[in-house]
């Protein structure tokens, strides 16, 4: 029973004896001992081949067996002994895996093998068996030795292996390991160049050939070796010069035609890998086009599409075609905005100065040479949001590590005498209320400021004339002279025929903050606007006021009259006039259809291959408004000349496909993201494809289930005035339109991105509006504020005033909301004045319209008559700036004001002329601090386009230091953890809020943002940015659903409720409980300090931890990860190589980010 064990122990002890004997013979090293050494090594080889335990004994570190064997190999000159030792090593490294191979490398085995290879080649003819053994071992060792390439070159082994392969082209047994070793050699860029000069390409092209079922393993290795060599630009040029690219294309076609059962997909993909590497250089791309490579790969890929297992071929082909697709110029005269607004002064060295100080005649749309010699490595790392554009930084580069800079410092940038002017905006702290009868009082609300000089003719609902709706809409009054037969309708001659079921505003006071989702609008046909009879034209519209208490079409028109825009808009969009009622159903996040992106990319490639099918017809152009566009009645009609509209140009490329170009922010040459435009003259039941072709961000939630929104006028007239999520086949990917270095921050070779979606319209000759997100205009805000003020009750202290005027001459409203004091007694007045201040703001970025909807929810809650709202008003004094950037909102900007700058980057040192809203908002905060009324909470509402859920960014010294790479002890940092209370409350109360997405890290690139400046300079510990997703939620009650206006307004009201609960933790009566609460949070914070998602998502999270798609298409088109310049030449490929002896397919890295 114990015999096997005893035998094993005996064999183990025997091999140890043999190793000792071999070591002794090595030390004696007498020539006469060759026979003895040969005999001992033979016995060891036999034992290793037959006993697993023997292999373990010899290969273990403690036995010293590896050193003894390598020493024998280095010293012996006997052929048979050498073969025996090589056999021993082959057995050890074959079964032992990486551990034994690592031991072999660490003991200098690689150098000994290479020296043996070189010395054996000097005595021709070389022994075939010896060379076979050496190369078989090198194949195993090479990928594990990080310096293998350098060692091979220094020992002179490169040409030895190459010559051996050259003279054994028909000897497949020896040729295979030679090619495998050459593949490992070539992973070093210097070696690849050297082998190319020595004729390696020519040798490999003698092996690579047309379809054959023989020696497929050899062919695969040869192709992989060739691909490795072609990573070198010099070798790629050599391949082009010798005409190898057409040869590869012909070989690929031959394999494609003959491999009908798809048994050799790996070989076909390897051929594509060679083509891909050649096209990494400009000369290669040119040769590819000249060899009809686009057509060849397009046709073969099209034939592969029905077979799912051929996706790797389609993906690689797509990558090559997109890389070789010629860069196109955006069809624009300039990338600067169509509209120009002269500034009072232009700061030297700023972005606007750079924009307008370009030499005359400079083309800012595309560079003279937009292609670099090497392909672009996609390093776009533009980040989102609150505070964007951090550049290309590693995880800890942007985190502030200077404790002195992190500690809040209250700075008096202006003397108090200058700040006294803001006392006017804080009258609640000085009013005595002696003249108010508290038994029968109403809040004194100043009337809305209406300047008759600002009134201009306004025409309601817009679009180009459409046969189906021409009798339902008033005519447009244009700034251009009218033809004699045109008779414009005066605004005053239009009356709104409301339905009889409308309700008075007074009946809706107590329902504020809640939309009546299930209310029905009585249907009925609409006769529309009669312009050919009668003295008065009547437009019957749905009575949205019955559903939406704060919307009044007539009042909206009055508000539009006093709104100043740079283009001088005289038109009103239907959705803004009719209003939007939130849907009473949930809209799920769109499930991505497999292959949709690939299909869109192939359709783009067809433009080059079948260029005669492209119409290229301009149907809308803001750059050329004076010249009429030809219209055959078949094209869609576009318009964006209304408040917040943004569409610069529309080009019909196919019968039902349109390329759309967005306008830059005014006084800027980029920020193309927000869109809002109108479409008419459509056919029902037809799939229309729209491509927005000048997007700039490197990724988007459109890749993760977000849809555009659409408003149908026909549906609104029929009783459904809703913005709805729409669009299928939605994806976002890099296109072939070049971005100039002027627009890309000095970087050359950049491209724009396409956001594409497909829509099928339901009604003939409808008028539909499309937007990036639910529009919320400045005029809509003014309307809502006036309706809110009209609904104010005696218990509410409400004051609305303009803090300042914007650059464009629009007022920036400031609201003060709290509860009236119970009486005019000193005690009640003192209680009134001692309430903490809450400062809220929103819409500093015009394209983040969701922040306005959240603010609307907060305002409606604050003005409602619910007990919670009354309690909240009694707890705090609210200072609210609902729109920090009215000019940007009005003029359809995405991020900037008329100054051409991101206002959320100006809080450190705002300019009174260029950034008046920020200047005066900061001054008001400074006044509050100077008078001892520093806000308890500051929160700036934002929107986030590349993350889901609602979350917050705050400021913490401890958490910032924890996330930095500086070894700083935080034990001595005393920090009140109260900044975490409000986010934690929100996570418990608001379904859309995600605490795990919050971050409290302070970054250097954010030092000029509202959140950081108010925390650092004003001393507000609870200073936040609250980000609301533009897409939807992936957790909680709304998981899997896109977000709508009702959810956003709910978030605003829940924020107010969280402030009410926050009072418990900040009230002096609750300090004991508050301290224990903070202790719990301290422990919780320590538990989570090492969780990766605590790092600031504002800077580093690009893909928002979204799951990868099954569709492995690289949206960037030019991903070239293997050419990472940061890696050492010897480390660039060696460490990642698969086992060369395996024919398994190399993993394809062209995955969608």
Curated annotation (Swiss-Prot):
Residue ranges, compositional bias (Polar residues): 1141-1153
Main location: cytoplasm
Keyword Metal-binding among UniProt keywords: yes
Gene Ontology molecular function, alphabetical: metallocarboxypeptidase activity; tubulin binding; zinc ion binding
Entry's localization field: Cytoplasm; Cytoplasm, Cytosol; Nucleus; Mitochondrion
One cellular-component annotation, GO: microtubule cytoskeleton
PANTHER family: CYTOSOLIC CARBOXYPEPTIDASE, CYTOSOLIC CARBOXYPEPTIDASE 1
Protein family membership: Belongs to the peptidase M14 family.
Name of the protein in its database record: Cytosolic carboxypeptidase 1
Lineage: Eukaryota, Metazoa, Chordata, Craniata, Vertebrata
Gene: agtpbp1
């Amino acid at each position: 029973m114990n015999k096997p064990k005893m035998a094993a122990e005996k064999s183990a002890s025997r091999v140890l004896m043999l190793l000792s004997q071999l070591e002794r013979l090595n030390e004696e090293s007498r020539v006469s001992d060759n026979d003895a050494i040969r005999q001992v090594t033979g016995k060891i080889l036999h034992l290793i081949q037959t006993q697993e335990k023997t292999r373990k004994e010899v290969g273990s570190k403690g036995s010293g067996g590896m050193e003894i064997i390598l020493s024998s190999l280095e010293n012996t000159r006997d052929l048979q002994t050498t073969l025996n030792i090589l056999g021993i090593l082959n057995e050890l490294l074959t079964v032992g895996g990486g551990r034994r191979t690592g031991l072999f490398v660490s003991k200098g085995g690689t150098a000994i093998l290479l020296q043996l290879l070189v010395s054996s080649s000097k005595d021709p003819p070389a022994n075939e068996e010896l060379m076979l053994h050496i190369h078989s071992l090198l194949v195993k060792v090479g990928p594990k030795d990080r310096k293998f390439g350098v060692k091979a070159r220094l020992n002179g082994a490169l040409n030895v292996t190459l010559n051996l392969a050259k003279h054994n082209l028909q000897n497949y047994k020896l040729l295979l390991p030679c090619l495998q070793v050459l593949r490992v050699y070539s992973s070093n860029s210097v070696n690849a160049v050297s082998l190319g000069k020595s004729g390696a390409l020519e040798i490999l092209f003698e092996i690579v050939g047309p379809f054959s079922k023989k020696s497929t393993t050899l062919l695969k290795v040869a192709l992989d070796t060739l691909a490795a060599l072609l990573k070198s630009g010099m070798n790629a040029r050599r391949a082009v010069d010798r005409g190898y690219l057409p040869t590869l294309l012909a070989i690929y076609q031959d394999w494609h035609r003959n491999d009908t059962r798809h048994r050799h997909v790996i070989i076909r993909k390897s051929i594509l890998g060679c083509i891909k590497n050649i096209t990494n250089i400009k000369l290669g791309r040119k040769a590819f086009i000249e060899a009809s490579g686009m057509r060849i790969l397009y046709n073969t890929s099209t034939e592969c599409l029905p077979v799912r297992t051929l996706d790797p071929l389609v993906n690689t082909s797509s990558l090559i075609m997109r890389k070789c697709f010629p860069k196109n110029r955006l069809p624009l005269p300039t990338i600067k905005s169509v509209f120009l607004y002269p500034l009072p002064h232009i700061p030297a060295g700023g972005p606007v100065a750079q924009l307008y100080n370009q030499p005359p005649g400079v083309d800012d749309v595309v560079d003279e040479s937009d292609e670099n010699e090497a392909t672009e490595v996609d390093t776009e790392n533009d980040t989102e949001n609150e505070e964007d554009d951090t550049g290309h930084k590693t995880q800890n580069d942007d985190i502030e590590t200077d404790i002195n800079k992190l500690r809040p410092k209250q700075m008096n940038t202006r003397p108090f005498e200058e700040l006294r002017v803001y006392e006017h905006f804080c009258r609640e702290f000085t009013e005595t209320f002696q003249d108010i009868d508290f038994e029968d009082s109403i809040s004194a609300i100043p009337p809305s400021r209406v300047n008759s000089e600002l009134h201009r003719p306004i025409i309601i609902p817009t679009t180009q004339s459409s046969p189906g709706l021409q009798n339902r809409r008033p005519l447009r009054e244009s700034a251009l002279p009218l033809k004699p037969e045109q008779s414009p309708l005066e605004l005053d001659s239009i009356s709104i025929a409301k339905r009889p079921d409308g309700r008075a505003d007074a009946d809706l006071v107590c329902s504020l903050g809640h939309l009546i989702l299930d209310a029905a609008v009585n249907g009925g046909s609409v006769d529309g606007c009669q312009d050919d009879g009668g003295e008065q034209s009547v437009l019957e519209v749905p009575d949205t006021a019955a559903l939406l208490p704060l919307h009044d079409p007539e009042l909206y028109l009055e508000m539009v009259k006093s709104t100043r825009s740079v283009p001088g808009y005289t038109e009103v969009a239907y959705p803004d006039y009719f209003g939007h009622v939130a849907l009473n159903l949930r809209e799920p996040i769109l499930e991505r259809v497999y292959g949709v992106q690939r299909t869109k990319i192939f359709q783009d490639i067809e433009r080059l291959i079948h260029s005669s099918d492209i119409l290229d017809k301009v149907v809308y152009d803001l750059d050329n408004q004076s010249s009429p566009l030809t219209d055959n009645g078949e094209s869609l009609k576009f318009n964006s000349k209304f408040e917040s509209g943004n569409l610069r140009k529309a080009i019909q490329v196919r019968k039902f496909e349109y390329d759309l170009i967005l306008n830059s922010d005014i006084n800027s040459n980029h920020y193309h993201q927000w869109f809002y435009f109108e479409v008419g003259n459509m056919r029902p039941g037809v799939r229309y494809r729209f491509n927005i072709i000048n997007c700039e961000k490197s990724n988007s939630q459109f890749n993760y289930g977000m849809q555009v929104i659409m408003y149908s006028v026909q549906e609104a007239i029929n009783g459904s005035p809703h913005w709805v999520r729409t669009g299928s086949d939605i994806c976002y990917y890099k296109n072939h339109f070049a971005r100039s270095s002027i627009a890309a921050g000095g970087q050359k070779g950049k491209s724009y991105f396409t956001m594409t979606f497909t829509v099928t319209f339901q009604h003939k000759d409808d008028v539909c509006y499309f937007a990036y997100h639910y529009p919320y205009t400045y005029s809509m805000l003014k309307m809502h504020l006036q309706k809110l003020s009209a609904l104010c009750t005696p218990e509410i202290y409400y004051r609305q005033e303009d803090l300042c005027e914007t650059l464009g001459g629009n007022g920036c409203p400031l609201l003060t909301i709290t509860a009236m004091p119970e009486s005019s007694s000193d005690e009640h007045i003192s209680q009134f004045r001692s309430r903490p201040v809450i400062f809220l703001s929103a819409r500093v970025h015009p394209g983040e319209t969701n922040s306005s909807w959240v603010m609307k929810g907060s305002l409606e809650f604050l003005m409602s008559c619910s007990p919670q709202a009354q309690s909240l008003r009694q707890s705090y004094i609210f200072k609210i700036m609902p729109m920090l950037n009215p000019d940007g909102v009005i003029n359809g900007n995405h991020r900037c004001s008329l100054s051409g700058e991101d206002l959320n980057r100006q809080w450190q040192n705002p300019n009174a002329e260029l950034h008046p809203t920020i200047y005066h908002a900061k001054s008001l905060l400074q006044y509050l601090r100077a008078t001892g009324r520093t806000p308890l909470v500051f929160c700036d509402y934002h929107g986030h386009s590349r993350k889901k859920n609602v979350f917050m960014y705050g400021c913490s010294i401890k958490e910032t230091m924890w996330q930095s790479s500086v070894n700083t002890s935080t034990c001595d940092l005393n920090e009140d953890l109260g900044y975490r209370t409000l986010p934690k409350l929100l996570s418990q109360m608001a379904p859309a809020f995600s605490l795990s997405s919050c971050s409290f890290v302070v970054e250097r690139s954010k030092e000029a943002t509202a959140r950081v400046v108010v925390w650092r300079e004003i001393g507000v510990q609870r200073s936040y940015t609250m980000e609301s997703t533009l897409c939807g939620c992936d957790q909680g009650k709304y998981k899997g659903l896109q977000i709508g206006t009702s959810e956003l307004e709910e978030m605003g009201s829940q924020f107010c409720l969280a402030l009410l609960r926050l009072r418990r933790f900040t009230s002096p009566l609750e300090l004991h409980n508050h301290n224990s609460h903070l202790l719990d949070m301290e422990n919780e914070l320590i538990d989570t300090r090492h969780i990766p998602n605590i790092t600031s998502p504002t800077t580093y999270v690009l893909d928002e931890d979204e799951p990868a798609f099954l569709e492995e298409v690289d949206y960037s088109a030019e991903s070239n990860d293997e050419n990472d310049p940061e890696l050492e030449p010897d480390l660039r490929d060696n460490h990642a190589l698969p086992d060369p002896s395996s024919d398994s397919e190399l993993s394809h890295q062209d995955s969608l980010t």
